[in-house]
Amino acid sequence: KNKKRLIPTFVMLNFCVVTSHEEINASEITFLKDHLKAERVDVLGCCGVQFQVHPDNITEELKLERSKKIDINFITEDERSVHLLASDMDGTILEEECIDEIADLVGKGSEVRSITAQAMKEGLNFDESLQKRLALLKGAELEVLEHCLSKKINVRPGAVTLFRTFKKHFGKTASLSGGFTYFSDHIQKELEADFSFANVLEYKEGRLTGKATGTIVNAERKLELMK
């Protein structure tokens, strides 16, 4: 029963890193060690364990677990030398899309989602889509953002463990978001991420102007930042 909640997030040529949203106990570690025929076990934290293992030792039982939404991936030893973990924020680190939550609170949820759907269907570029959606939020009070952050936004289970473990053992971490710094600055602190980039909402006299200031963090900008 317990082993079903374990989530192997990625398997390398000579290593298998297992993470869970709950504490991994000694019996679960022993189960995985035996079935992987692991030569070495390194406990990365209460919710993470690394096994030195050969891919041939992935058993049929663990392959069966893969069909139950467990993600098992192989990469070469050369590819293992990863030094940067970069992730989107909205809908990735966070369970929600911040702009949708803000829009819901000001009665513009369906309109904002309609623009998003149109952009995906008709190829409207991100900058145009963002400008149209932000225009619908014009006049919203900053208290709406505060309420959204404290009551509506949830960090996805495992995200904090992933970021902190990667930072401790591998390299730098970054959040690259097409969302907003109002939220990403708070999330960066919780993740203990090294870097965080997002769009800056413009406001005057405590209300949103319906615009963003500075360079828009779109797909091209994210690529530039990673370089």
Q: Where are the regions that the model predicts?
A:
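Non-catalytic pre-domain segments flanking phosphatase-related domains
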Residues: 3-87
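Generic structural marker for isolated residues within well-ordered, non-membrane alpha-helices
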Residues: 29, 61, 99, 184, ...
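Active-site neighborhood of HAD-like aspartate-dependent phosphohydrolases
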Residues: 79-124, 132
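A short secondary-structure junction motif
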Residues: 109, 140-144
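Long, charged amphipathic helices and adjacent flexible linkers at domain junctions
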Residues: 124-136, 140
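C-terminal cap/substrate-recognition subdomain and adjoining C-terminal extension
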Residues: 144-227
